[in-house]
Amino acid sequence: VVGESLIDIIKTISKKDWYLLMKDNSVNAYKFYNPPYEVTEGYFNSGIVHEYSSPVCSIRGIYVNILHHKITHGTIHLSTLGQHPNCNTGGFGDACPGSFEDRDICLSDPGKLLTLLEEISSTYEKIHLDSSYYKPTIPFDVKQEYKWKAS
């Protein structure tokens, strides 16, 4: 039974280029970027977006420890060239979980797991400037993203 569930997870997440990487104390869903993904955009909750003139950093990989039942500090790691502003260090470090904190990691439904993983990757492909460890000093253009509101 465990074997079938594991195969279902692997088949589902691999459709979007996620893989399982097993280590001593963790089982990580891993997304590898080749070439590394250049992070050139940051946003604030207010809707203001900074488009940087050059990459702030490049993501080589995202690791999500799926042995954690909920996302906490230490669940998401980034492998980067340079330091991602939402990560505690450059190279390889803990990503700030931000709004992902306490979200369930659902292994019983591979589709839900894949949805969460894709949400995580699209989040860290940008910079959440409201909760960054530092603000990039690279020149940027500002644009306003409009938020639709129901009337």
Predicted segment positions?
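C-terminal folded domains that constitute the principal catalytic or ligand-binding module
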Residues: 113, 118-133
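Charge-rich (especially acidic), low-complexity segments
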Residues: 130-151
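Compact alpha/beta protein-protein interaction domains typified by the UBC
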Residues: 1-108, 113, 122
